[in-house]
Amino acid sequence: MNCRRKPLPLHSNEVQAAESISKDELYSWTLKNVLILFLVQYRASTPSALQTSSFSTPVEKKTNGAFSGSLFSAKEKKDNPKYPKDFIKYLSLALESISMGKEPEYQDQLIRGCFAAFYNNINKSHISKQLKDSRKIEDMFLIFASSVSSELTKRLGTAYDSNLADRITASFIELCKRVTLKGQLASPSSEFVSHLDMYHSKLLNKSEILSTKRVNRGQDQFDLSSFPLLKVFSSVFKVAYSKALLDAEKLFPSIDEAAIAEDIGILIEDLESDACKFSHSVVDFSNYKSYSTWKARELQTLEQHRKIMLSLIPLSSSPNHPIQPIGFPASRKTPTYVPPIARPYFRQLLSLCLEYRLQVTDPVEVKQINTFIRECSIYWRILPSTRCALSMDFAREHLQKGLITSADVLTHFGELHKSLKEWEITYWPKIDVSIFSSALFGIRNALAQLLKKSLLDLLHEKKADFHRWLNIMSICVEDGKVINQDLSPKSEISSVALALQEHCKVIFDEEFDLSKLPSSNFLDEIILASNRISVRIKFLERNCSECIYGVLSLPQIFINIVLPNYIRAALVVAKEYLREKANADINDLTKDMLEIYSDLKQMIHVLQEYHNEEYRIGSFEGFFQPFIDSWLDNVEASAEQWFLRSLEKDNFDENSSEGQYSSSIVDLFHAFHQAFRTLEGFEWEDDLANARFFTRFFRVIYIVLSKYTQWTTQKFFEEANKQDDTSEVQNDNSSSWFSKARNILSGSNEVLPFRFSPTMCILLNNIHFAMHAYEELEQKIDLQRLIEALDVAESTKRHKISATNYLYTIKVVRGEGLHPDGAGKIRTSYIVLTDNKGRRIGKTRPIHSMNPRWDDTFEVKTKDALMITANLWSKGKFNDHEIFGRSSFTLSPKIYGDYLPREEWFDLNPHGELLLRIEMEGEREHIGFYVGRTYHDLERAQREMIKFIVNKMEPVINQNLSTATLKKLLSANTWMDLDKTMTSVTSLLNRTGFSSKSSENVKKEGELTDVQIEAAIYELLDYFDLNFSIIAKHLTKDVFVTVMSYVWDEVVCTTEELLLPPVSVKPINRKPLSPAQMAIVYRWLQFLKDYFYANGEGVKLPVLETDHYKELLRVQEYYDKPTDFLLQECDKIASQLYLSSRMVNNEPVESLPRHSRIKFANKEIYRSGTIRKVHIQTNESELERNERIILRILRMRADSKRFLSKHFQRKGRLLMADAMRNGYVMPLGHLKKLDSR
């Protein structure tokens, strides 16, 4: 293929060529194209459509114009709409502009003169007043008709053509419509605009523009005014329609069908011969396939056009243009109606059309413009790709100049996508692809600038719809993929982000720089500025929350620039304020400074949220730390008032609004939570400082709750003493002196039942409520994190045992082998603990027994070693007390430094032994300690109250579950009236609801029935009924279950004492129970378990079936076994336990450093956080339980003394070895004591 033409010029050259085309030349070529379109449509239509049926009738010339009739009669319709209120104002401005020649569409001198005459008339006062009052469009049209008539008479004389006046009036109506729509005075569908269209239509129908203006060519007459594209043509070129019509009438006779067909033939010949003078060549395409595809389509289209034109040629063709036979070469070498190079002409024409389309609002007219563009491109053989590429290029240009809206841009893209479906971009010429690519890049860059403008408006809190530009940008990016171009706007968006950053700096300097805001109160400055910044951030987050293309986040840009600068400026202002107030009290400044801290802290949180990491600004927290300390000082000073005010308002009424607890504890925790929310709101980021703050706060709570528990416990026992005194008075009144004397002489201890008051229950409920409320408060903080922060800070400090306070907990468990009095009677004994200075530490309750079990706990706080003396006192019947035993022991960190609890037997001089359980804990300025001690105090108070309740029940329990009761039950002479017993038992069964075997179910002769066994303890069950009903009514459900579990544990312990002595190395002079006695004891245990369970309505089985209870049930397995069997079993168990211990300690602890071994064994409360986590007790293994049972049974066997001594010596050595493996060396005196045993 030999192409004899160079490739199409570059885009820039094409633009220059288009700009060099004169408007008149373009006007001429375009008018030819319009007339060709008219001729084609005329020939293709039916003869009746556009051609007159008879041409012999002469046109009658009218001397009177349209205004002489009733076209604009004011009486035509009384309810004609009035023109809008500001219509005359906008119309006057348009008329003034036309009169001065500023409007290119109205350059005709006659039109300008007529419009100027009308403009002068309506500015006259009387006419202006008339129009203002009536606002009727008919009045205005009559005034305009008079003005036109006068002006035309003055210029043309009285013989002017009336059609000229009609055309001028039609132009005026069009002007009125344009002014209305452009000024948005009325909608296109309004009644006023409809009336304008109606008058315009009537005027045209009456005028001779449509009826008499004809063009003659041969025997045919043509009406060019009926062609709508001619009107579009006049508007595009901004000439009067009358002028365009006259030019068309002059040019139309030269338009010939044969010449048109010949032009098409020239184009076909040019394409087939590859001359490429008037069409594209192969060099214009990226590959030959694209060119051949285009060429085939183009030839097919041109052949169709030529056939159509030949079919439209009339039989009598023009003599000037004879029909050229098909297949013969054309007589001309250049087309007559097609420009030599059509692309520049079409580009210039498209520019005019698009500019005019921007001014049009009527959709019908917009559609006509699009049709005009398409039809012109068809005959000039402009490809759809060229039309789309140039259209996108003009869209880029108009967008950069701000001439079009987002809707207009979307219209261009819609036309593009429609064209791409018809003509794939693969077959586009290279020049069109280049233009299209440049247009997309330009549109993308323009969109970035428009996006920047919208975002700037958002920074100033102005509404801006930037999403429309983003949507168009996404369309542009997708279209770029069609031409294999990466139009990702990330770099442009990054540039926009940098510009926005600079603008944010300006915003800070102008609006939020506190140093430039003059004010007398710096606090007001900071608070107001903080509020404005918060409002601005919320506005940005609400209107522009997304991150644009992963590059630009408007809120983050604003926050990153403004907030750090603002915080620094605020700190500078705050420091300046503190320098001015250097002599003021810090407490007076605390409130203001904490308000500033809260505002600035909120700003920092916003920064951290957008950075997803900690954001620190210098020593921000360090600057405000003294004011946090001052606030904590105020809290500590107010704590005493919290305590006192809470007690002043509390009446401890059981009918209070709080329910089963009183108002004092509720008020206290309300104050705690209020202060806690303030401290938590500080959100201190420095873990160590935050841990110290919370340590101080929880120390305050510890102090207040410690006082409250002491006061509550004291009031509880005062209330109990009142009840105790009342019971004694009632007993004194009911008992005879003879009964008292008999008890004294017999040595028996009379049991006085105790009645519990509702106030005691409310006090116990308060303590339980405090425990749960404190637990909820503790769970709101990350206690473990605070503990770790304090531990890490103190890890470098050298561990010194003597540098801290220590808390010793001494539990007086029980006594054994106590000596009777001189008469051989059992003593009522108690223990009093004193220190080396004679100060009393504590006193146990008196118990009437040779082997009393006190289980009373006391606490001693000291730094140094302390000698404790335990004095055993005897309480006489006549309040005469005497000491009959004494033992001493030392409390020292050197002995109890492993922080493990120890149970030790101490000899009571001269007779008996005392079992103590001693445990040491550390006390430090540590949040873990205060939290743990608070739990400890609350639980201790609750335990003491519950223990008091159990202790009051204990004598009744011991009196009924005793060897005396067993002996009486098994004696031959029954000690109770059977009828009375049966009546009481039947009543008891009806009350409790648990079933037992009936009295008719009698066992073998001589054996006791279940009814008789139950009847022996009916007084105990009656006592339980009376007191449990009171505490169940006034205690909360959880506390009631706890009390019942304690009572049940007392029942189990009492039953255990009937069966076994405690573990000890020394034998005991005690005989085991007989099989019958043991059976009765276990029947009692089962009866009481059923009583507490109450068919599922009482205490749940998991609470009743404790390990202690299960261990008691296993006593039956070994109780009657021979001594040799028990000795062998004990040795076997000891060996197994030794092997198990070696396996557990396979990894020795001595491999750890010294401080780690101490920490490993440490049982301090603060190391585990809460008293609930201090020491998790594991269930004793079955082997250890069996060993303990066997050792207790062996104490009652006379021939086991030597075995017990050796067994405990061996066990002591094993304990010493374990302690040494754990890195702790026991004191020598302690080891000697173990060996002596």
Curated annotation (Swiss-Prot):
GO terms for biological process: endocytosis, site selection; exocytosis. Gene3D superfamilies: 1.10.357.50, 1.20.58.1100, C2 domain (2.60.40.150). It comes from the Eukaryota. PROSITE patterns: C2, MHD1, MHD2. Residues 1014-1130 form the MHD2 domain. CDD domains: C2_Munc13_fungal (cd04043). Residues 591-712 form the MHD1 domain. Pfam families: C2, MUN. Residues 786-906 form the C2 domain. GO terms for molecular function: phosphatidylinositol-4,5-bisphosphate binding; phosphatidylserine binding. InterPro entries: C2_dom, C2_domain_sf, Glucose_resp_signaling, MUN_dom, Munc13_1, Munc13_dom-2. One of its GO terms (cellular component) is cleavage furrow leading edge. This is Uncharacterized protein C11E3.02c. It comes from Schizosaccharomyces pombe (strain 972 / ATCC 24843) (Fission yeast). The lineage of its organism: Eukaryota, Fungi, Dikarya, Ascomycota, Taphrinomycotina.
